[in-house]
């Protein structure tokens, strides 16, 4: 089966939160259980070592073991690790590690140690593509200051470096331009709070944050949206949006982990330099999550 036929990045892939114990050590047992629980509750796969997974504060040994833990829990076909790094050679090594662990695809940010120009972006993706594992580009110009605009995405796709893009710019208009320039490039919803808009624009998947806490309702929302069941999708989306919008805020990791705690999962602490939510932030997240629980969505 070809990469184009398989497309393992389609569907609901959860950018997994990473559990730490009280001493801030990675709890691999809890992480394995969490990955399995997400799949059991309808999610199509997991994305370890993304921003939500706090990969920036992991040691290389921890980061590698997180991938191996996810693969052991749900199988490599369901695992798409983030392989971001400051250098192209290091990112390629992470892609090779994912490949050797059995992962079917990887997710890659552009260079983000500085504001890379187009030639640097092309060279970066070309180098990591040498690992031989399909790449999903991750466009997050808000945090990286490097914007994978539709024209650049089309070129990356035409040169065979990427097969899909996680689109986190917040500009839903881009979906239509991407479809015009690169119709075979899969668009993945990259921010929870534009899910409905991008689903209607033809998205093929969702790299998601809030299913960490509410997988069944999140999957129901996604399936309704992409199938055109707008009555179901709009009602669910409107009710969940007070939570979903936290995925686009600076405190998204803390918010999603708190929601996990509220619904009875283990979200737990974050590693520094992240700090706990302010009292008013915690109250808002807790209230919105408790409302979702009362509605039977957890």
Stretches with model-predicted labels:
Residues 31, 63, 67, 91, ...:
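A general structural signal for well-ordered alpha-helical segments in protein cores
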């Amino acid at each position: 089966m070809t990469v184009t036929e398989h497309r393992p990045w389609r569907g609901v892939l959860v950018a997994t939160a990473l559990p730490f114990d009280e001493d801030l050590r990675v709890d691999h047992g809890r992480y394995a259980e969490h990955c399995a629980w997400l799949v059991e509750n309808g999610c199509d796969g997991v994305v370890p070592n993304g921003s939500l997974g706090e990969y920036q504060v992991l040691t290389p040994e921890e980061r590698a073991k997180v991938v191996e833990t996810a693969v052991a829990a749900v199988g490599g076909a369901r695992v798409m690790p983030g392989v971001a790094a400051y250098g192209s050679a290091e990112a390629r090594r992470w892609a090779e590690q994912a490949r050797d662990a059995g992962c079917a695809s990887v997710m890659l940010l552009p260079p983000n140690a500085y504001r890379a120009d187009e030639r640097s972006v092309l060279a970066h993706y070309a180098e990591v593509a040498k690992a031989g594992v399909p790449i999903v580009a991750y466009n997050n110009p808000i945090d990286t200051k490097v914007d994978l605009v539709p024209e650049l995405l089309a070129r990356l796709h035409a040169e065979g470096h990427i097969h899909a893009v996680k689109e986190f710019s917040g500009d839903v208009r881009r979906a239509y331009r991407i479809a015009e320039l690169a119709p075979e490039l899969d668009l993945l919803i990259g921010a929870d709070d534009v899910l409905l808009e991008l689903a209607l624009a033809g998205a093929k998947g969702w790299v998601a944050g809030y299913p960490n806490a509410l997988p069944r309702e999140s999957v129901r929302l996604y399936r309704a949206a992409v199938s055109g069941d707008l009555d179901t999708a709009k009602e669910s989306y409107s009710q969940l949006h007070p939570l979903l919008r936290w995925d686009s805020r600076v405190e998204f990791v803390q918010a999603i982990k708190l929601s996990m705690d509220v619904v009875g999962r283990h979200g737990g602490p974050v590693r520094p330099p992240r700090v706990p939510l302010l009292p008013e932030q915690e109250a808002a997240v807790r209230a919105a999550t408790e409302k979702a629980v009362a509605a039977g969505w957890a």
